[in-house]
Regions:
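Beta-strand/loop-rich accessory regions of lumenal/periplasmic or secreted enzymes
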Residues: 1-197
Length: 197
């Protein structure tokens, strides 16, 4: 069974009403600089190594070029026999870059993974500039309910200061995502960024 698809670097998010304020210049800059559609070229051939414990480590690197500047992304995946995967990503700016709305990865999960639980800020969506009014705890929801239906489609459903997130089907099978060092932010939505913009 396929549990994940289309892992790729992610430097764009659907603009919010706040981003569109001030004459819409920030959201326009993101689009003009092609943050939503970088040209991706291979920087390093894919290399796979079988480790002594039976795990397999795969490394690769690619360059994401924008209208102004680029970022080299280095990936290392280690896959274990129990089904767990260690994923490390490093983002190396190469030139003067525009203001980046986000830096991370996006991927597509099967529709059967319809439940989400996380330990972090919640239960409502939180952002770096809007999180202190929320509590840290363990929260449960469905993927469909992670999206808040604003009058104008925009970025939604982000959660800050997250230690772990579980994305599961109705039998409890799926993904547990944690950060090796520190906390992270995540969103799990039934829509792609392009559908929201």
């Amino acid at each position: 069974k396929e549990w994940i698809n289309c892992v790729k670097p992610h430097f764009f998010r659907a603009p919010t009403d706040n981003d569109k304020g001030f004459g819409n210049w920030l959201a326009k800059e993101w689009k003009i600089n092609k943050l939503d559609s970088p040209v991706i070229t291979q920087e390093k051939d894919i290399e796979a190594i079988r480790n002594e414990d039976g795990s397999v480590t795969v490394t690769t690197a690619e360059r994401c070029s924008f209208l102004r500047g680029s970022i080299v992304t280095q990936y290392q995946y280690t896959m274990y026999s129990d089904g767990s995967i260690d994923f490390h990503a490093k983002y190396i700016p190469q030139d003067s870059l525009p203001t980046m709305p986000c830096i991370g990865n996006t991927f597509i999960l099967p529709n059967t993974l319809s439940n989400v639980s996380w330990y972090g800020r919640g239960p409502m969506e939180t952002y770096p500039d809007r999180k202190t009014s929320s509590s840290i705890g363990r929260w449960n929801n469905t993927i469909d309910d992670q999206y808040f239906h604003y009058s104008r489609p925009q970025d939604s459903g982000n959660h800050e200061d997250v230690a772990e997130v579980r994305l599961t089907d109705n039998k409890g099978k799926g993904w547990l995502i944690t950060a090796e060092n520190g906390l992270f932010s995540y969103s799990a939505l039934p829509y792609s960024v392009n559908q929201l913009y």
